[in-house]
A protein has these predicted regions:
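N-terminal Rossmann-like NAD(P)+-binding domain of SDR-like oxidoreductases, especially those catalyzing
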Residues: 1-132
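PAPS/PAP-binding and catalytic site of the sulfotransferase fold
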Residues: 210-215
């Protein structure tokens, strides 16, 4: 491998449904072992890493039990909650991590821990971005990943759509981040990597760029 000074680690099997077919080793080998290989390459070359993690590191059941209020087109988070790390703007980085989160989310969280160990042990510099819903050109949307492009394509080409879960009304909400905005963020972090070294950030579009499936 030619010399390099940075790895942008965004490779993964990104489906939350991956592994439910009885093949968990594929997800573990692709996501966790893949990150391990990238970290070793970075260590041997004296390189740093920007790791694109996921909002799926947060446990599914805990999220599903959050107090919500039902509006005409979407669910809104209630002010009163029984867990920390949640507010009107959504989840922050202090949200509890105990519980199940899918093999995808678990392997990405374990990859975060690996990066933090490499930072501590080998003096590598790195930053972790827990991305929410990303979208933009060349996203190949499908049922289990790339929801914005998938839904847009189904509307354009007259495909079938169904609301799954949460009462089947399509009121569940996700915020969306364009890939160009993610690019700007990464550039900003790299310009002052010492400041962001070892930090974990939730990365999304925020309430201003959020929508429900129904909307």
């Amino acid at each position: 491998i030619p010399a390099f000074d940075l790895i942008l680690e965004c490779s993964a099997e990104p489906s939350v449904l991956a592994g439910y077919d009885g093949l968990p080793d594929y997800v573990v080998n692709t996501n966790l072992m893949g990150t391990g290989n990238c970290l070793e390459a970075a260590r041997l070359h004296g390189a740093n890493m920007v790791f694109l993690s996921t909002s799926r590191v947060y446990p599914i059941e805990t999220i599903n039990k959050l107090n919500c209020e039902e509006g005409e087109t979407r669910f809104e988070l209630s002010i009163e909650q029984t867990v920390s790390g949640i507010g009107p703007r959504g989840l922050d980085e202090t949200f509890p991590l105990e519980g199940g989160r899918s093999l995808y989310g678990t392997t990405k969280l374990c990859s975060e821990f690996l990066l933090q160990e490499y930072i501590a042990m080998y003096g590598m510099k790195g930053v972790i971005n827990r991305c929410g819903g990303l979208t933009g050109p060349w996203q190949m949307g499908k049922v289990d990943q790339g929801v914005v492009v998938h839904w847009a394509a189904q509307h354009v080409f007259g495909g079938e759509l169904a609301y799954i879960g949460y009462g089947g009304m399509g009121k569940q909400v996700r915020d969306v981040l364009h890939v160009e905005d993610l690019y700007d963020l990464i550039n900003f972090q790299l310009e002052q990597l010492d400041k962001h070294n070892g930090k974990v950030y939730n990365v999304g579009g925020g309430r201003e760029v959020s929508l429900s499936l129904l909307e």
